């Protein structure tokens, strides 16, 4: 039975290698003009950006509805005291509240996404380096050698503060 199992594993491994080698996939090069255009593409295609955009639009609509865009302005009510012919300058923030809110929301969104992408890029470089180390050590197919690799990776990630605990792989 063990002979049959090892033959099946060899056949599956050979089949996987043949499929991978026969695909001859070529990676696209120079898709983006610069790292900034790549960054914008990544940010726009994330769900967090869409959520922030919807929140910004909701906030802007709510701000305009409650400040009286469709009817009387709250400053025109009798609650403010006697009305004068002299109108006060409402100030930059009041006049351009929509633009200010949109700019602040986009700045927060882009900075948050930039932080997350920086963290992922750093984490990706560490994983690439560790993958090279795995290839150099060439673990066999038994679980004991892979448990050693996982334990080394756990301690490596914990020591470099890439993970909060020593138990990324349990």
From Swiss-Prot:
Glycans are attached at residue 45. GO terms for biological process: cell wall organization. The chain crosses the membrane at residues 51-71, 98-118. It comes from Saccharomyces cerevisiae (strain ATCC 204508 / S288c) (Baker's yeast). InterPro entries: DUP/COS. It is found in: Membrane. Signal peptide: none annotated. It is a multi-pass membrane protein. The keyword Ligase does not apply. Pfam families: DUP. Belongs to the DUP/COS family. May be involved in cell wall organization and biogenesis. One of its GO terms (cellular component) is membrane. This is Protein ECM34. The keyword Cell wall biogenesis/degradation applies. Keywords: Cell wall biogenesis/degradation, Glycoprotein, Membrane, Transmembrane, Transmembrane helix. Coiled coil: none annotated.
